Structure formats: C-alpha cells, structure tokens
Amino acid sequence: MKVSNDRPLAEITLRKYEKPYEMSRRDLIRKICLSTGLLQPGDSRDVIVDIFYILLENKKEMNCEEIRGAIINKRNSEKLPLNGIAASNVRRQLRRLREMYFVEKVKNTYRINENENLTNLFEQKIEKFYLHGILARVKDYLRELK
C-alpha cells in the first residue's frame, strides 16, 4: 500500500472582509495582504504591508536595502514602530510576495510583477493559474471517492 505524502504542492489562504470604503492606501494594501493570507489577523508585525506599499508607489525596481530604507522612512513619518525591519525579514517578506506572484525579482532588485496592474495579476496568476490548479486537484480527489 502506497502512503501519500501529506505535504501540499500548493497552498493558498483567502479571506473575505467587508467592502472597501474610504480607507487609506495603506489600509487597502493591508486588507489585500489579509485577504490573500500574506498577513494574519491581529498580527502587529505588518512590514509586508509597507514593502508592498513602497513597491506599488515607486513603480521601479528597488534592491533590498533601498526597500528597507524606504520602510524606515515611511514608518518614522507615520510614527509606527520599527518592528520587523531586519534585512533578513524584509527578504523573507519579499519572497512571500514573490510566491503569490505580486512581486518579481530581476537580478538583485524587486518590482511589482511585470509592472502590471494588481487586479490583472490576481486574475491571471492566482485566480486562473494557481487557484485553478488547486481546485482541479480537489475535484480529482472527489472523483476518486465514487
């Protein structure tokens, strides 16, 4: 008897929140991170929000140190604590954004994937490709139960 491997080949967390209304840009990005599982509810270590915000605002390729410097400036200007700004954590959060296809690495710099609109990225990369594959596999398991 073959024992199946319980390690997922792909995994995604999606959450539904209230409709957006009169929110700051940072709060909208925070909701996107919460909705796509990049940020956990109640998590105060939200540097991923600032990374995403900075890459969206700058619309250019930035290296890790430039991103980190921009995070420090942004958090200081908004009087937010400097939690989670270690270079290793910034790189880890960039990797998570890359895994969700929002960010791509070009040489040693990062940018929004193909400088594309986020709605298009979500529809093309996550909805049609990533989510479709997961749903198809769940259906395979359901069909096997017949």
Residue ranges of predicted features:
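Eukaryotic partner-binding/assembly regions in large regulatory complexes
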Residues: 1-16, 125, 129-133
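Short alpha-helical segments that sit at the start of domains
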Residues: 14-63
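Short acidic, hydrophobic short linear motifs in intrinsically disordered regions
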Residues: 61-81
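Short coil turns linking two alpha-helices in DNA-binding domains
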Residues: 85-86
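A short, conserved structural fragment
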Residues: 95-109
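Basic, amphipathic "hinge/linker" alpha-helix immediately C-terminal to the N-terminal HTH DNA-binding motif
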Residues: 109-119
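Short, amphipathic alpha-helical interaction segments positioned at domain boundaries
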Residues: 117-146
